[in-house]
Design a protein with these regions (language model features):
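Nucleotidyltransferase catalytic core that binds NTPs
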Residues: 1-146
């Protein structure tokens, strides 16, 4: 079985994230969504809520699992025997950041590959931070959430 991990904070998990998972499932047999967090900075209940929300999206998709992790992505990948990290890229800045992360993952993960999915044009403006900002101002964000 070819497993990939998809890591992020997913605060919140958006339709852009869901699109990446869908596209990854076309290539991999299993996708583990890893919610990265720093226990010193993030309440565990916040992470548990995100896990529950994402699991609800994939309740009928047995090829997707969701869990939290608080160490290196390469270590998280190794625990799941993952062959790749999948990431979404919306901007040139995203690409530069993910390219550097890919190098670290390859070095630390014994050849762990990174597969980049470029955001579909209609989803390129969707980001968790933008959704949080809209929520802060009381706007309806349902169209940005799966």
């Amino acid at each position: 079985m070819r497993t990939a991990i998809f890591t992020g904070t997913f605060n919140p998990f958006t339709i852009g994230h869901a699109d990446i998972v869908s596209r990854a499932l076309a290539i991999f047999d299993h996708v583990v969504i890893g919610i990265g967090y720093n226990p010193a900075k993030t309440e565990h209940s916040d992470v548990e809520t995100r896990i529950e929300q994402i699991e609800a999206v994939y309740k009928d998709e047995p090829r997707v699992t969701v869990e939290a992790y608080d160490d290196m992505a390469a270590d998280f990948a190794a625990r799941h025997n993952a062959v790749a990290v999948v990431k979404g890229v919306r901007t040139v800045q995203d690409y530069e950041y993910e390219r550097n992360q890919a190098e670290y993952n390859r070095l630390l993960g014994d050849g762990l590959e990174t597969v980049l999915f470029f955001a579909r044009p209609q989803l390129a403006a969707v980001s968790s931070s933008a959704v949080r900002t809209l929520q802060h101002f009381g706007k309806d964000v349902s169209r940005f959430l799966p």
